[in-house]
Amino acid sequence: KKVLIDLKQISKKKFFKGLKFSNLPILMGVLNLTPNSFSDGGKYIKKNLGIQHAKKLIKDGCDILDIGGEATNPGSKQIKEDVEWKRIIPTLSKIKKLRKFVSLDTRKSLIMKKGLKFKINLINDVSGFEYDTETIKVLKKTNIPFVIHHMKGNPRTMQKNPKYNNVVLDIYDYFEKKIKYVRSKGIKHNNIILDPGIGFGKNLKHNMN
């Protein structure tokens, strides 16, 4: 019953600090500072190209800039923290000067801690806190909004014949467990976004459902 109440409160959330919800969609512009992301891998890793693209995303109407330095598309391999941060820092340091709502896409607690020093507004962990158990401690300490993302398996395995009893109900059950988990770790706020993870451990039929 408590989890159901939490889910209703999260779904009715009207705003986060620096971001208001209304009847209009909120657009997130994705900036992949990687050589191997599926949509724009390698396009923005060179000097100044990342910030130039960020400005274009803002001009095109994006409310959130989601910046990441590690590809998590199907078949991608994990990278070391120092490599990920080296990709992110040149652009992140400039993006915050644009005074926009910035989301940091990372699975690693160390990258989160470093990003928080640049006053990021949101943490987007596609692993649902399963990759690095220290991430939940970072979230509790900072009280920052975050995304609970659903992914079946990991980036290397998630598209290898994913199966569900009922994809909608299974994902709902997953979010129930995750909310129970974050509550058990002492996170009381409802600054939470639930992402069903379209394309992450799901075939076309799963995605359409």
PLM segments and residue spans:
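Glycine-rich, proline-tolerant flexible connector loops at the mouths of alpha/beta enzymes
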Residues: 38-39, 63-91, 198-204
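Alpha-helix-loop-beta-strand connector modules within alpha/beta enzyme cores
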Residues: 77-104, 110-114, 141-151
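Short beta-strand/loop segments at the ligand-binding rim of alpha/beta enzyme cores
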Residues: 24-27, 96-105, 121-122, 189
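N-terminal amphipathic alpha-helix/helix-capping segment at the start of soluble metabolic enzymes
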Residues: 1-35, 180, 187-188
